[in-house]
Amino acid sequence: FYQAANTIYRWSAEGRFPAWPSAWLDRGKPQSIIDLQRSKEFRAELPRVIRPDILLTADGPRITELDSVPGGIGLTAWLNRAYTEAGAEVLGGATGMLDGFAGIFGDAANVRLVVSDESATYRPEMEWLAGQIDPGRFSVHGQDFADFGDGDAVYRFFELFDLANVPTAEPLFAAAADKRISVTAPPKAFLEEKMLFALFHNRNLTETWRQQLGDSFQRTLEALLPQTWVIDPAPLPPHAAFPGLGLTDWQQLKSLSQKERNLILKISGYSEQAWGARGVWLGSDLPRDEWSAAVDQAIEGFDESPRILQRYHRPTRVDAEWFDFELG
């Protein structure tokens, strides 16, 4: 999916494809970020760690978004080990996450895990991860570190919207562009946009996605990725409506009943409000006035911080076993 999205963005930016996909994905970003993600030095680079946010619903799993700068690698590794030691059959075994994470850096002699102040709550997890894999090879550094050596591999644990506050960002990306070091995730803000799901569901791009993904995988993603729309305030022709919604103007979202508001508004990306549970509004859980205010923010914020609208699939309840330490 990321390979296909990378191709669509590149073709659009280079004029080999309609301009609107890259225009959407570049919306609200400074020219420095746009230049960086279009740089030929990072042309084919993709994130090497991807965490899908998966909801288990009555109709099967749904992937609500993808995170290419995720926390939780160390936590998942610890859980894998704990459950394996307790006798559970864990996908990947006790060391699957550790082995997988170590494997993305190839044979680099030094692996630098660079954590920004904004992401500092995850630093203990990164330090644990480095210590479990190889403390002589893996090291954790703050946002001021810039002593990169030729051949180093870097895991970027800071957000692109925060670059102005990360002194190491400029020398890091310059060294990566010169091929003196490698870095993941690459500085491609468009791959961190939730609106990629809206591009996937856009009928104008269906054939392009099919060519890039193949019929089978396209059908798989159609079942997994919830229907998504970009809140673009550009007016529609009088006879047109947003597919799957029957609305002709985003203002009409305000008049939907609470049942009809089984929809989520989210900030698409490139914002300090675009991660965690921030920047998310579930229409069916909000009173009409709060939902209307969120709709207004989405419409008015398109140029600076685009929002997406996504069909909400309610998670299902499942039975789970647990261990009672008092009863044994």
Where in this protein do the model-derived segments appear?
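Low-complexity, highly charged intrinsically disordered N-terminal segments
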Residues: 1-36, 61-62
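Conserved metal-phosphate-binding beta-hairpin within the catalytic cores
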Residues: 39-70
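Amphipathic, alpha-helical segments enriched in basic
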Residues: 29-31, 38, 47, 168-171, ...
